[in-house]
A protein has these predicted regions:
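Active-site-proximal loop/helix segments of hydrolase catalytic cores
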Residues: 188-263
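Pre-active-site segment of Zn-dependent metallo-hydrolases
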Residues: 11-16, 39-88, 92, 97-104, ...
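Short, Gly/Pro- and small/polar-rich lid/capping loops
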Residues: 1-19
């Protein structure tokens, strides 16, 4: 199993056409990815505060600014000031708890794109941090599904985003923790994990424009394992070049990752949110509990016909660089 992990930098020859430079993705652990295109930076919601399982279940939890700064530095990121958007498809604490502090202190240009419940949960935290509430945007009404629809959101000169209606698999034995939606703004910051209600989960499709006018690069971001067809892309947007998929809780639904791979026809798969987030951030973490990661990898291998060049299991801090196809001489 240890041989399956990727560390350092991995180059993926996926790009066609006239891209000026590479598209880089740095895995920050849990759901966090820093996605850098030639002209735009986007962050998917990271977690560095990592309260213990006992504190999460029984105590008070909050963002730890020291852990956030140390975690970013540990994984090679020292500047988030250029980030224009922070994405979180649902509002559980392990996705959203650290985001307001990052937006307020490290990413002053970023909009926080969340579901309705996420916006309502973050409202009092934004006030406590001096973060303008207008920067927290509910994108639920922009979402597409497998039948189509939806509205693209511009994130930068070369990047646009399509939210996708998705789902959150049960955590174990058919039970989904912290399920539910929020009908109005919280009046004070959440104190416990159970106050970070999930809301209606979204996935995301990013399109990076080709400077040469060719086909855009498409990156699919799965926020949580979903029952099919939730989280599917409309067929006209397949294939995607890179799909970021979640192994955690895969056994709670049928046909994951097979169904989403059939839908997206992804050329490459990167795995996130696979590690134990009840321990402090580490460059060499253990897999999350209740997930048989070797079994998931075996299923993924079968789904890509045994081609190990088509998937990456990154350790936190790993950087993926999407470059030109080897037969593209331009």
């Amino acid at each position: 199993m240890d041989d399956d992990y990727t560390r350092g930098t991995r180059s993926l020859p996926l790009l066609e056409g006239g891209f000026d430079g590479r598209i880089g993705l740095t895995f920050l652990g849990v759901g966090g990815w820093l996605i850098e295109t030639p002209r735009t930076q986007v962050l998917t919601a990271p977690l560095f505060s990592n309260p213990s399982i006992w504190r999460t279940g029984l105590g008070t939890i909050r963002a730890d600014s020291t852990a956030i700064v140390d975690g970013l530095r540990r994984f090679g990121v020292d500047d988030l000031s250029g980030v224009t958007a922070i994405l979180s498809g649902h509002a559980h604490y392990d996705h959203l708890m650290d985001v307001p502090w990052i937006a307020a202190r490290l990413s002053p240009r970023a909009r926080v794109l969340v579901n309705t419940t996420g916006q309502r949960t973050l409202a009092p935290i934004a006030d406590s941090l001096g973060l303008d509430r207008s920067r927290i945007v509910d994108v639920s009404s922009f979402a597409a599904d497998v039948e189509g629809g939806g509205t693209w959101i511009r994130l930068g000169p070369d990047v646009r985003l399509l939210p996708l209606r998705s789902d959150h698999a049960p955590h174990f034995a058919g039970l989904t923790l912290y399920d539910g939606t929020r009908g109005s703004d919280l009046v004070r910051p959440p104190r416990s994990a159970e106050e970070w209600l999930e809301g209606e989960t979204l996935a995301f499709l990013l399109e990076v424009a080709d400077a040469g006018g060719g086909r855009p690069v498409r990156i699919y971001v799965q926020d949580a394992v979903a029952r099919e067809p939730w989280g599917f892309v409309p067929p006209r947007y397949a294939p995607v070049d890179l799909a970021i998929l979640v192994p955690a809780t895969y056994a709670e639904v049928d046909w994951h990752p097979e169904a989403i791979l059939e839908n997206t026809r992804a050329r490459h798969v990167a795995l996130g949110h696979w590690e134990n987030f009840f321990a402090p951030p580490s460059a060499d973490p253990e897999p999350v509990a209740f997930t048989l990661l070797p079994d998931f990898i075996a299923r993924l291998r079968r789904a890509v016909s045994g081609d190990d060049s088509r998937w990456t299991l990154p350790m936190p801090g790993t950087r993926l660089e999407l470059g030109r196809l080897r037969n593209d001489s331009r």
